[in-house]
Amino acid sequence: FEKQIEIAKNNYDVIGSNILEVDQNNEIQNLEKQMPTSNRDIKKYLKSRNPINHMTAFYKTDLVKKVGGYPDFYHREDYGLWIKLNYHGAIFYNINESLVQVNGGKSLFKRRRGFKNIPAEFKLQLLCYRLKIKPFYLAILHFFARVIILLLPINILSKFYIYKLRKKK
């Protein structure tokens, strides 16, 4: 966390970074999840996608306590927290570098899909609407778009992630 500690001196409340995905054999897949870096770009990105890779997150715990901590949103607790922190004026920053390697592949896609994720997605979109992150119609549109993605077969979902949500390194 050396880089995050140094950057935190600039009064950022939440600091993250890009991640590099590896497969089950710890082999690099050459897939990087790149994130927006500036506070302005992160807040814009927040309206449609999770702007902080949770495993890289470095944040002020007093601010997290002030907003009531993580919401109870199955597999979306971190995204819900960033939404709450944004509403309370948190300042975000992402380091434009992959500081962590994460397990991608089928295990990632199995966790990210299925009916069990739908109620949490609804709660997340409702939170976005209630905290004025997005208008109601957009929250509903995003909810239904994500439900479709959540119900995709793993082989199609993996291609969607690889070709639409990741960058080749």
Which sequence ranges carry the predicted segments?
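Surface-exposed charged/polar residues within alpha-helices that form helix-capping/stabilizing sites
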Residues: E6-I7, K44, L127
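Conserved donor NDP-sugar-binding/catalytic core segment of glycosyltransferases
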Residues: F1-N30
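C-terminal subregions of glycosyltransferases and related glycan-biosynthesis enzymes
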Residues: Y74-H75, G80-I83, Y87, F92-K169
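A generic structural signal for ordered secondary structure
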Residues: A8, Y12, L31-E32, I91-Y93, ...
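Conserved nucleotide-sugar donor-binding catalytic segment
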Residues: D23, L31-F115
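Glycine-centered small-residue hotspots that permit tight backbone geometry or close packing
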Residues: G16, N26, G68-G69, K132
